[in-house]
Amino acid sequence: MDVMNAFDSQAEDSPTSLGRSLRRRPLARKKLSEMVEEELEQMIRRHEFGEGEQLPSERELMAFFNVGRPSVREALAALKRKGLVQINNGERARVSRPSADTIISELSGMAKDFLTHPGGIAHFEQLRLFFESSLVRYAAEHATDEQIALLTKALEINSQSLDDNALFIRSDVEFHRVLAEIPGNPIFMAIHVALLDWLIAARPSVPDRELHEHNNLSYQQHIVIVDAIRQRDPDKADRALQTHLNSVSATWHALGKKSQKMR
C-alpha cells in the first residue's frame, strides 16, 4: 500500500456554483503527525498489527511515512492517549486494547469544563442519582453474600473515619465504589470513579468543622442502604439511596453558598 499517496492529496477544483454561494476561505491543513496517527490507527484497527505486537521503530516509521521524528512521536503519543498503544522507555510502542478507563479519560476534560457551566454540577448530580439508583437496585437483587460483606466492611471503615474529614471522604468514595463493583461491569466502574472524581473536584473548600454533622448523617444513610440490600428490597434500597444523594447535594449546595458569602 502506498501510504504517502494519502499525504500528497491535491485539492479538487470547486464547482463554480459553490464559489458563488460561499465566501472563499482557506481549508485547514492537517499536521503531519495527525496524518501519521490516522494511518497507524487504521492499520491497528485492520489488525495489520495485532494486540501485544510491537510497532516498527521510530526510525522505520520516519522512513515509511517520510516525516521527521517529532511527527512520529506526536502520533504515537496521540495513539497512547486513545489506549491503542503502550509506550515504555527504551522499547518500541506496543499495540494495546483501549480499556474503559481510557474511554472515560478522553471525556474528562470536557466533563470538567461542563461542570463550570451554570447548572453543570446539578446535571452531573442528576446523572449520579440515575446511575447509582440502578446500581443499588441491582445490588439488592443480585449481590452475593461476599459482596454484602464487602459493603459491611466499607461501612465499618466509614464509622471509624467520622472525626477525620479527609479519611471520611476516602471511606465514602470506597463505600460507593464497592457498590459500583457489584455488577462486575468495568465500564460501570470507570464511569463511577470518574463521576465521583469530577463532582468532588467541583465541591467548594469548607472548614472540617462544617462537615462533621454531614459525615455522621451520610454514615447513617449508608447503614439504611446496606440494610435494604441485605433485606433484598430494591425499592427500599432505591429510596434510601435517593434520600442519601439528595441530602449530599443539598448539603454541598448550602456549604457552597455559605462559602461565597464569606468571601
UniProtKB/Swiss-Prot annotation:
MF GO annotations: DNA binding; DNA-binding transcription factor activity
CDD domains the UniProt entry points to: WHTH_GntR
Record keywords, A-Z: DNA-binding, Repressor, Transcription, Transcription regulation
- Domain of life according to the entry: Bacteria
Q: Which residues bind DNA?
A: 58-77
Domain HTH gntR-type stretches = 30-98
The segment annotated Disordered runs over 1-25
InterPro entries named in the record: GntR_C, TF_FadR/GntR_C, Tscrpt_reg_HTH_GntR, Tscrpt_reg_NanR, WH-like_DNA-bd_sf, WH_DNA-bd_sf
Q: Which GO terms describe its biological process?
A: negative regulation of DNA-templated transcription
One Pfam family linked to the record: FCD
Provide the family line: Belongs to the NanR family.
Instruction: Report the function annotation for this chain.
Output: Transcriptional repressor that controls expression of the genes required for the catabolism of sialic acids.
PANTHER family named among the record's database cross-references? HTH-TYPE TRANSCRIPTIONAL REPRESSOR NANR (PTHR43537:SF53), TRANSCRIPTIONAL REGULATOR, GNTR FAMILY (PTHR43537)
Protein name from the UniProt record: HTH-type transcriptional repressor NanR
